[in-house]
Amino acid sequence: MSCSWMIPVFAILAFVASAAQADVVEHTFNVATLSLPRICQPGNTSVTAVNGRVPGPQVEAREGDTVVIHVINDSPYNVTVHWHGVFQRGTPWADGPAMVTQCPIRPGHRYTYRFAVAGQEGTLWWHAHSSYMRATVYGALVIRPRRAGGYPFPTPYEEKTVLLGEWWNGDPVALESQSFSTGIPAPNADAYTINGMPGDSYLCPETTNRIAKFEVRRDKTYLLRIINAALNTAFFFKVAGHTFTVVAADASYTEPYATDVIVIAPGQTVDALMAADASPGCYHMAISSYQSAIPFPPRPAGFNGNTSTAIVEYVDATATTDAGSPVLPVMPKPNDTYTANQFYTSLTALIRPGRRTVPLTVDTRMLVTVGLGFSSCQPEQTQCNRSAPVVLANMNNVSFALPNTVSMLEALYRNTADGVYTRDFPDQPPVAFDYTSRGLLGNSPLASTGSPSTKVKTLRYNATVEMVLQNTALVGLESHPMHLHGFNFFVVAQGFGNNDGEAAGAGEFNLVNPQERNTVAVPTGGWAVIRFVADNPGMWAMHCHIDSHFAIGLAMVFEVESGPTPGTTLPPPPPDLPQC
């Protein structure tokens, strides 16, 4: 049986190790310009891609393997690659964020990323970490258990990688450059995608047969590795007629959680088991945006119901089965914060012997506001309207700016921080106020943000850190997916309203089995409390994974000092490290 109204065009992209027993996984990424058809517009557009594909190749390894990726930049842009969620213990130079751990790879140059995936299993991903290039430069990084091990859940019949993305009909890098120059936010994406394809909800000839397809067999169980690679959008994810059991988030195992809807913010991953137990036929897999912002924005034009689709097709149905049109799931409303909060707060960690547990004592406490504010045009914004304020993002009223002469990690290693960054990122906001009051929306003098600067928070090696991430209503309330490089953290509490560091007492904390993540969606008009141990020397960015916010300063960097032994000391840079 087949869904006769469409042509099967989807195939999972995968890279595998060169030999069955290899402990080194080695690949070459050729970064170059690729011409692809526009969506609901005639003609093609030029984008940057890896190995001629969007999404790029899937990298597969086992826990304990070493990954070696040779990146050759034949594009017209500077590029770096970030291995999202990889700890990079002993290899901080391979983390990838431009001007934090390395200078970019210039056009015509190359750089080799070498790192081990030790103590990690599950679904991670890789993406460009310079400008909006990650709109098309991204792919999956799957880390399976060692051969002697196995999953802490029933072995699935097959695994399916599901990469969620956004698509612009113009060059995303050029759009970001124009946005910075003018001080006007870049336009919304022209479409959402599943494995690079828009699906059948965009009713125009240009999308005919551009839909991903996942074939399943009845009564088999599948592991869906779901990755939100979108630049700016959180998604609701459903498959009509099917339910899920979530077993991992951000490559950390969870207690099994049954649900019919998955909520996934930019940067996050979810592993979910799906039983193919519906009547044989064709079913829509669908994503729709979770638009958390208050005031609630209008839906972007051209989004045809704000939903993109793929097909789940039963391949072992009888010939008499009605192929018909696929069933479409009922999606939550775009501003359904209740459903989002229900999902996020229902996940807990699966406790396993020998694995990390939440720290019970705290050395460093921080209350950090995350949100938007206003400032004046910067000198580099050559087309900015200097008679009106521009939007900047900030943490504790500090809008982050990347250095432009040397990477922060090089400055740390060579002890030349002066003129590159300062060690005065504040532990508290400059003024305490009613952070989430709707009365602040868009008209408070507290929204004034100073000029962007490069400030870090220095942490002693092995210090335990507790951060309260507090959303603010200045300019607008919105859920911010905050991603920490170099570490996982435990989400010990989250809620709505204000948390001044005392409001959520220890009695409200989950100090038994809190979910472990590398990216937390701070609730709209609320807060999240995270804990981690600073046991990884280096420069580690923490930033909003909404790229339109990161680009205007919603970021900071932790400078983690070296420990007492050679194995806990910042290593020297590799000989081929790119230079600015």
Curated annotation (Swiss-Prot):
Pfam families, per database record: Cu-oxidase (PF00394), Cu-oxidase_2 (PF07731), Cu-oxidase_3 (PF07732)
What Gene Ontology terms for biological process does this UniProt record contain? lignin catabolic process
Endpoints of the signal sequence: 1-22
List ligand-binding residues for Cu cation 4.
H480, C544, H549
This protein's cofactor list reads: Cu cation
A single GO cellular-component term on record: apoplast
User: Has the keyword Cytoplasm been applied to this entry?
Assistant: no
PROSITE patterns tied to this protein: MULTICOPPER_OXIDASE1, MULTICOPPER_OXIDASE2
This enzyme catalyses: 4 hydroquinone + O2 = 4 benzosemiquinone + 2 H2O
Q: Which residues bind Cu cation 1?
A: H82, H483
One example GO MF annotation: oxidoreductase activity
Co-factor binding details: Binds 4 Cu cations per monomer.
Q: Which residues are glycosylated?
A: N44, N78, N306, N335, N385, N397, N462
Compartments, record wording: Secreted, Extracellular space, Apoplast
**Residues where Cu cation 2 binds:** H84, H127, H545
Annotated InterPro entries:
Cu-oxidase-like_N, Cu-oxidase_2nd, Cu-oxidase_C, Cu-oxidase_fam, Cu_oxidase_CS, Cu_oxidase_Cu_BS, Cupredoxin, CuRO_1_LCC
List positions binding Cu cation 3: H129, H485, H543
Q: Which NCBIfam families match?
A: laccase
Question: What family is this?
Answer: Belongs to the multicopper oxidase family.
Q: What is this protein called?
A: Laccase-6
Q: Which organism is it from?
A: Oryza sativa subsp. japonica (Rice)
